[in-house]
């Protein structure tokens, strides 16, 4: 279901990689494709079926004979699999989409179940748009489906219309009014159109549902599906009131989220619950102080429990002395090595001007007593880039290093930005590794600015750089020069500390 959100279909290799990640994280059942939809999807289901051993695989099918046959044949290499059949049951869908009455819908559903039982005894049936289906009709079709062998009854909130107490009401009615409901598991499949997919899923658990369908990062059609990692951690953290558990390997959550984000080319919003970059970061001085004293003060989840290990305190003008001292301590400095009052005063001035401050900025303030802007050693005076049709790019630059001007050029097949970076490196000769490159549009139209953020590793330490210009190549060059100045600044601090030790 998550693939419906993507602008382009995933390759077989990418789908297999995701399936292996889901197996490693410990999902009970994974829906690996819709085999009838395309030859490529049929092939991917075949290949995944041969490689997944610890999770049960499942394929989707309409109540159409060829769909069901394709699903069964595609998964035939697996020893244990499920066929998931779906059919709309709401009056709206029956009348305007299917042009059928409810009696015909029941007949179609029963036919499909009987066909699927030729391949496996594990059948799941989704009453599409169940949340807008009359409760009488829903109870009636569910009873007949279970009678004919369906083991999992899925109740989808197909358009994300339901609120938690409504879905809870539906589940409770099924448990109370369907006499053979004990022979099946009730599942829910929620969409996030009103932002309630996770809340609805939790409400369904409390009402008696025992299978939750979702996707990692909530990827899905329109506003997305239930974010699986959010439901998982809600169950873990609030087991006291939910009274259920999962077989999930929690430490794989963060890693799995990042891999799927990368494969699907769908960035994770910073404020995304559980896996967002800000999920365990703290900017307020009061919060930072509280977290440093005891992380439970402001963190209900131990970040390491999901594979996110490092405590992240953002150094901004809202940060207090505790955060500054924490960063200095992390870099190996004792309280007696610097004056916290002077450092904090200088830090606030820099934070007001710069926005976010980094560890190497603190070092400069503490031991050189100058703002980083005053320590700019490198200044890009000129650059020119030429790219030709054979893929080669040549960059020529003039870089002022202190009082001396250097001229350098570089040719590469990796594009104009790489050509500039190589030319800069020839002059500065810092052994750096580019770890992250991000381009962000600032504004719209021809006057829009491109902001480039880069992250560099130098001598096992991270350095950040930002560049802003109307041309992204110029932004990229400025970002690298910014990084080089930060590295040079850190080197000056090291020299100063070595002198103090003599």
Curated annotation (Swiss-Prot):
Record carries keyword Protease: no
Catalysed reactions, semicolon-separated: 3-methyl-2-oxobutanoate + acetyl-CoA + H2O = (2S)-2-isopropylmalate + CoA + H(+)
Needed cofactors: Mn(2+)
Biological-process GO terms, alphabetical: L-leucine biosynthetic process
Gene Ontology CC terms, in alphabetical order: cytosol
Main location, first listed in the record: cytoplasm
Pathway(s) it belongs to: Amino-acid biosynthesis; L-leucine biosynthesis; L-leucine from 3-methyl-2-oxobutanoate: step 1/4
Keyword list, A-Z: Amino-acid biosynthesis, Branched-chain amino acid biosynthesis, Cytoplasm, Leucine biosynthesis, Manganese, Metal-binding, Plasmid, Transferase
Enzyme Commission code(s) on record: 2.3.3.13
InterPro entries: 2-IPM_HCS-like, 2-isopropylmalate_synth_dimer, AIPM/Hcit_synth_CS, Aldolase_TIM, LeuA/HCS_post-cat, LeuA_allosteric_dom_sf, LeuA_bact_synth, PYR_CT
Residues annotated as domain Pyruvate carboxyltransferase: 1-254
Subcellular location: Cytoplasm
Residues reported in the UniProt entry to bind Mn(2+): 1, 189, 191, 225
Region (Regulatory domain): 379-502
GO molecular function: 2-isopropylmalate synthase activity; metal ion binding
Keyword Cytoplasm: yes
Entries under PANTHER family matching the protein: 2-ISOPROPYLMALATE SYNTHASE 1, CHLOROPLASTIC-RELATED, HOMOCITRATE SYNTHASE-RELATED
Family the entry assigns: Belongs to the alpha-IPM synthase/homocitrate synthase family. LeuA type 1 subfamily.
Function: Catalyzes the condensation of the acetyl group of acetyl-CoA with 3-methyl-2-oxobutanoate (2-ketoisovalerate) to form 3-carboxy-3-hydroxy-4-methylpentanoate (2-isopropylmalate).
Quaternary structure and partners: Homodimer.
Name of the protein in question: 2-isopropylmalate synthase
The encoding gene: leuA
């Amino acid at each position: 279901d998550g693939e419906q959100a993507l602008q382009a279909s995933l390759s077989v290799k990418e789908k297999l990689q995701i399936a292996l990640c889901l197996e490693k994280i410990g999902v009970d059942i994974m829906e690996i494709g819709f085999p009838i939809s395309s030859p490529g999807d049929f092939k991917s289901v075949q290949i995944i079926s041969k490689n997944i051993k610890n999770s049960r695989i499942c394929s989707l099918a309409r109540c159409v004979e060829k769909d069901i046959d394709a699903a069964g044949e595609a998964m035939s290499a697996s020893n244990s699999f499920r066929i998931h059949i779906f059919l709309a049951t709401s009056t709206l869908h029956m009348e305007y989409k299917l042009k059928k009455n409810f009696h015909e819908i029941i007949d179609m559903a029963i036919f499909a179940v009987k066909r699927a039982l030729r391949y496996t005894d594990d059948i799941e049936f989704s009453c599409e748009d169940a949340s807008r289906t009359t409760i009488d009709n829903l109870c009636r079709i569910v009873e007949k489906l279970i009678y004919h062998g369906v083991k999992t009854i899925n109740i989808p909130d197909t358009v994300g219309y339901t609120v938690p107490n409504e879905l809870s009401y539906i589940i409770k009615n099924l448990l109370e009014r369907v006499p053979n409901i004990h022979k099946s598991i009730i599942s829910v499949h929620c969409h996030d159109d009103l932002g309630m997919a996770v809340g609805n899923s939790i409400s369904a658990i409390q009402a008696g549902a025992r299978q939750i369908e979702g996707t990692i990062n909530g990827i899905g059609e329109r506003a997305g599906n239930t974010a699986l990692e959010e439901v998982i951690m809600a169950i873990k953290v609030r087991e006291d009131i939910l009274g259920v558990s999962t077989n999930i390997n929690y430490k794989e959550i963060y890693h799995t989220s990042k891999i799927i984000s990368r494969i699907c080319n769908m960035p994770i919003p910073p404020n995304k619950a559980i896996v967002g970059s800000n999920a365990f970061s703290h900017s307020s001085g009061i919060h930072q102080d509280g977290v440093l004293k005891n992380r439970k003060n402001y963190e209900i989840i131990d970040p390491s429990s999901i594979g996110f290990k490092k405590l992240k305190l953002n150094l901004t003008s809202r940060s207090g002395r505790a955060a500054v001292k924490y960063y200095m301590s992390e870099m190996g400095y004792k309280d007696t090595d610097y004056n916290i009052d002077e450092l904090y005063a200088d830090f606030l001035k820099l934070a007001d001007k710069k926005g976010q401050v980094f560890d190497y900025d603190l070092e400069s303030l503490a031991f050189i007593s100058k703002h980083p802007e005053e320590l700019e050693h490198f200044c890009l005076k000129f650059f020119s880039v030429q790219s030709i049709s054979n893929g080669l790019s040549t960059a020529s630059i003039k870089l002022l290093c202190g009082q001396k001007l250097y001229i350098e050029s570089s040719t590469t097949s990796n594009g104009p930005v790489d050509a500039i970076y190589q030319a800069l490196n020839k002059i500065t000769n810092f052994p750096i590794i580019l770890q992250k490159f991000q381009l962000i549009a600032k504004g719209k139209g021809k006057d829009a600015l491109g902001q480039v953020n880069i992250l560099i590793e130098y001598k096992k330490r991270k350095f950040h750089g930002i560049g802003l210009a109307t041309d992204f190549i110029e932004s990229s060059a400025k970002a690298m020069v910014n990084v080089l100045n930060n590295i040079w600044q850190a080197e000056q601090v090291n020299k100063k500390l070595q002198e103090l030790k003599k």
